[in-house]
Amino acid sequence: MAGHDVQYGKHRTRRSFSRIKEVLDLPNLIEIQTDSFKAFLDHGLKEVFEDVLPISNFTDTMELEFVGYEIKEPKYTLEEARIHDASYSAPIFVTFRLINKETGEIKTQEVFFGDFPIMTEMGTFIINGGERIIVSQLVRSPGVYFNDKVDKNGKVGYGSTVIPNRGAWLELESDSKDITYTRIDRTRKIPFTTLVRALGFSGDDEIFDIFGDSELVRNTVEKDIHKNPMDSRTDEALKEIYERLRPGEPKTAESSRSLLVARFFDPRRYDLAAVGRYKINKKLNVKTRLLNQTIAEPLVDPETGEILVEAGTIMTRSVIESIESHLDGDLNKIVYIPNDAAVVTEPVVLQKFKVVAPTDPDRVVTIIGNANPDDKVRTVTPADILAEMSYFLNLAEGLGRVDDIDHLGNRRIRAVGELLANQVRLGLSRMERNVRERMSVQDNEVLTPQQIINIRPVTAAVKEFFGSSQLSQFMDQHNPLSELSHKRRLSALGPGGLTRDRAGYEVRDVHYTHYGRMCPIETPEGPNIGLINNLSSYGHLNKYGFVQTPYRKVDRETGVVTNEIVWLTADEEDEYTVAQANSRLNEDGTFAEKIVMGRHQGVNQEYPANIVDYMDVSPKQVVAVATACIPFLENDDSNRALMGANMQRQAVPLINPQAPYVGTGMEYQAAHDSGAAVIAQYDGKVTYADADKVEVRREDGSLDVYHIQKFRRSNSGTAYNQRTLVKVGDVVEKGDFIADGPSMENGEMALGQNPIVAYMTWEGYNFEDAVIMSERLVKDDVYTSVHLEEYESETRDTKLGPEEITREIPNVGEDALKDLDEMGIIRIGAEVKEGDILVGKVTPKGEKDLSAEERLLHAIFGDKSREVRDTSLRVPHGADGVVRDVKIFTRVNGDELQSGVNMLVRVYIAQKRKIKVGDKMAGRHGNKGVVSRIVPVEDMPYLPDGTPVDIMLNPLGVPSRMNIGQVMELHLGMAARTLGIHIATPVFDGASSEDLWSTVKEAGMDSDAKTILYDGRTGEPFDNRVSVGVMYMIKLHHMVDDKLHARSVGPYSTVTQQPLGGKAQFGGQRFGEMEVWALEAYGASNVLQEILTYKSDDINGRLKAYEAITKGKPIPKPGVPESFRVLVKELQSLGLDMRVLDEDDQEVELRDLDEGMDEDVIHVDDLEKAREKAAQEAKAAFEAEEAEKATEEAAEQE
């Protein structure tokens, strides 16, 4: 027997064909969300407050300090928040200290700081009753970047940019004349020496002393001449910079100094963030820049005078490691003192080394390092600016290297915690201005923190972020895999990111640093391709937001691959050689071959085993979760694998799902971490279990109660239903499944079913990827799903009186009211179809001035005789089903409703959808198709043992698409079904060809895995042997019921008076320019005329046509369409005297748009008006009679 058994949870064993020993379990798959939010609550929020506070008033007599904060218990539970359309949030209280510096008085007070949304255990937020996800954003990291560009003459020039987290950019560039310029905040360029002089190094000699003598420096110094002898060089430089930044304003050295300090050296205006400081220190540090360079002067220990490195030594990694402590210390440190007129007058500490130029052995080049400022320094320093200029000048000498912006060492992830912190910071900085003003205006004696703090800017910023940010998304809840993928999504779009239109091919492309960090397969097709990515299965964020991936360390001395795990970011990995996970190992852990496949800086090739530093932990670390669920992924073309990964996320949860016979072993972990199942929080024993709740008694005697969700509506309108897995007496451990979620079976992801599939054509019905299906799949509810739709109706106060929910609806027969209760609300369990009343509601109508008799009637009979119109909630077009639940919210019951709303009724309708012709189905290999025919079981081809086939697919769909994985799955699936086992074939480490055929043989199948099929209609065998097996097929969310649409009478656009478009608006089908040509070509003038008039925007024509059709009269001639009138007005507005004449040369009056339109009515629907008018006339006649009778009766009674 090939393979070995692996236990997944307590309910499933699979035969696994993997050969690689996994040394590291998958991390929790939603930790990117939960860890980030936890870090935000633990210290991120505190850091934001400490960034903005303390705040002083303008005279510096008062100061407001931050002390601490406390988050209390949430107001609602999760379930209550969902039901009441509320947010799951907790009140936050912040303690402030107000210090009066004149009197020394201190007031400490706790201030309510609004409700803050709290993340659920599943990594989601509940905002206004809807479950949302904050998608992590992929952005360019702050730091310093160098690039090269070739001009039209083929000359290479360089550029560099310092990009902060927030603040002004500082750029350097060289031109064709080898002069180096700098730009501050994208303004006009100035020679870079001007900025050096402004930093306090004004003399030409000083500049040559710092940077050394190079052509770029010399040319720039010559260009930067002293124009105004009245000013010192520093003052002149400052004024020149001020003129660039504030053109047209009077320039003084002092104003320029304060402007530059504000732009670059004020922590409130300029922030590199921890990550920016880390990246700058890493790039400008001398250790990385000296690597593999030849030193030109001996390196001497400043304390002892000992020569550490002789001149002419090549600085290999080992040499640098031997003097690392000296490099981090005072070795070659030089302190420069700027002159008194400088922007920053503190001494500038640099590290200066001289090396031999790589391009010319006779030249010496100066390398300046920024001497590693402390990590706490969040602004750029003069030392950073000088070191950046030095790196820039070194590039022209062949030292250093330019950066690749798409390298994942230069792109980082902003997860939910950081995105929230930025929003709070934004709100606090708006609040700061407000606080400062109130401190200055009000009387110091009576001020308290509560009085000067207005929390509205902060709560508004947070609310806006959750409600309308591009990164706050309605959770994709089709199935647990789509939830999980959504939580792990990385988007390059959003505020501060890229835009679709401006993103080129390079940004979207797969980069070698994606390996183990971002999935190269799973990304949307269409305009977002490559901009929206997914975290790889082992991917993990470090404290700076860079994605790390785990590797097994190789002991270089012994050659043993250890079980020690090291997490590396992309730029750390560039320094090493990494072997692939499927490299063969001996028993003692050494490599079995002398040469192994590995990679170093993106070069994939064979490397000697003795130079390998690390080895991958698992073959599936390359791909994301959804991709890792595709068996035989290694046999599929990547384009089709992309579709397969994406389509699994669109699978509809079925009534009784089956886990795949051929899985990858990923199904268990994906289901476990998705948040859709119920997982035991503690060890214990089950004491009670039914469909609604499970009770587990812990060992310490306390009781855990787990509530099971039954048929809740998911965000996607599918049924979110959980099924209990345990029974009384079961012992459960922490992390065990207590209940399956939707699309799960026995603790594994189960998106579809395992039908018997044959690759054969049948009567041409599977042309173009269509799917032929057996009626058994319909009858046995194999592909049946439940869909829940929510409808709501609310009663409001109107000018004419309140609306009311009632059973007494005008002009509605008793038959339509049969399922309504005495309030007028549908009963639970009622079967409804389109047009049925769900909630009876009437709205008062406007009345004319009443006559004396009518007033008398009102006085006698109350409001019964008032005119009302029917505004009931009805089942919309194309919907039907069974009423699953009704929820009623009223102010009387203490429910929070919007202002003006008195009552809200929600009706949930469940719809059972069997699979039908027109539904879309797919396998896991991108093999998708639409059901074209459902054939009776008896007509389907059958196997020699009489088993009919369930599905027939077109064999022509395989070769050109190159997704051969489906054929492998087919054969292995049949073997698994015959043997009664489940199989795991992990990606890149699955069943080999030998495993496949030995399993086929074990199952007793024919050696070619094909079989003879017999025609169900005739009983004759088909000519050729056919590949028949079991393939995992899923039903996708694109169902024909949601797409079918027809319009008879419907709404029109207010402006153009043409029918609206789309199913949601109950719109018509667009008859475009080309379709008009087609009718013109056939000379179908009458058809064309009615399409362009009655059916479109001839307002009077369509009214008359409607009337004529209802009364059975001939349809009158059409009039002038509205769009023609618009054209005439357009030409008239251009000054052309254009009029329309009839055959007698009389001018035709075109009605004005305002005529016949009620100003209050935004949505004009003339046909509805005509209907209503007819109904009103009939009703008025009927009511006049009734009123007469009533008067007579009243008179009689008197």
From Swiss-Prot:
Reaction it catalyzes: RNA(n) + a ribonucleoside 5'-triphosphate = RNA(n+1) + diphosphate
Q: Where is this region: Disordered?
A: 1174-1198
Q: Which organism is it from?
A: Streptococcus pneumoniae (strain 70585)
Name the UniProt key words of this record, in alphabetical order: DNA-directed RNA polymerase, Nucleotidyltransferase, Transcription, Transferase
What are the annotated GO cellular component locations? DNA-directed RNA polymerase complex
Taxonomic superkingdom = Bacteria
Which HAMAP family does the protein's record reference? Answer: RNApol_bact_RpoB
Entry's family note: Belongs to the RNA polymerase beta chain family.
Q: Any idea what this protein is called? A: DNA-directed RNA polymerase subunit beta
PROSITE patterns to which the protein is assigned, alphabetical:
RNA_POL_BETA
**Pfam families per the UniProt record, alphabetical:** RNA_pol_Rpb2_1, RNA_pol_Rpb2_2, RNA_pol_Rpb2_3, RNA_pol_Rpb2_45, RNA_pol_Rpb2_6, RNA_pol_Rpb2_7
Report whether Nucleotidyltransferase shows up as a keyword of the record. yes
Q: What class of enzyme is it?
A: transferase
BP GO terms, sorted: DNA-templated transcription
Basic and acidic residues bias: start-end ranges: 1174-1192
Q: How does it assemble?
A: The RNAP catalytic core consists of 2 alpha, 1 beta, 1 beta' and 1 omega subunit. When a sigma factor is associated with the core the holoenzyme is formed, which can initiate transcription.
One GO MF term attached to the UniProt entry: DNA-directed RNA polymerase activity
The gene name reads rpoB
